């Protein structure tokens, strides 16, 4: 039993290693485009270690990151950089994720990055949407190969946060 537990832990860590390394590789060869942001590390913890959690489902990872990044870009474009705008960006991201039933805690950091980094709408596409899409596809394939339960796009209507 302990061996199976340790094997599962290793496979979770190995999956995160592979995915983040690939994003890091893309990042190192494209100086004009960022592929990797810190919240993706936390997304991998959910997608690999607690893959059955509603917070780790593809819909939550993808749209949680996108909506949160959009929240940060919007607040920055309206208010600029201040401690109030940073707090408002995170608060708006949480509100939007809750309303859209796409709560993904790592995505809560995206507005901070967007506002403090003075990011524009391009930040939402690259690295956020592109990287989150890669993570979702990787998690679906990796978890399927390991015969783990992991929700796919066809399962979105059955998610607890989808109703």
Q: Residues of each region from the PLM?
A:
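Pore- and pathway-forming membrane helices of multi-pass small-molecule/ion transporters and channels
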Residues: 35-50, 90-120
């Amino acid at each position: 039993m302990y061996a199976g537990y340790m094997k599962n832990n290793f496979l979770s860590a190995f999956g995160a290693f592979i995915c983040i390394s690939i994003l890091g590789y893309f990042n190192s060869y494209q100086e004009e485009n960022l592929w990797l942001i810190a919240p993706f590390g936390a997304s991998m913890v959910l997608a690999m270690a607690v893959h059955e959690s509603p917070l780790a489902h593809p819909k939550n990872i993808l749209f949680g990151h996108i909506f949160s990044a959009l929240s940060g870009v919007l607040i920055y474009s309206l208010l600029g950089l201040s401690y109030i705008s940073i707090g408002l960006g995170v608060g708006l991201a949480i509100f939007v994720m809750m309303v859209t039933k796409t709560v993904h805690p790592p995505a809560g950091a995206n507005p901070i990055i967007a506002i403090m980094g003075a990011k524009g709408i391009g930040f939402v596409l690259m690295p956020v949407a592109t990287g989150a899409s890669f993570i979702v596809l990787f998690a679906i394939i990796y978890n399927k190969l390991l015969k783990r339960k992991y929700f796919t796009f066809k399962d979105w209507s059955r998610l607890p946060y989808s109703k």
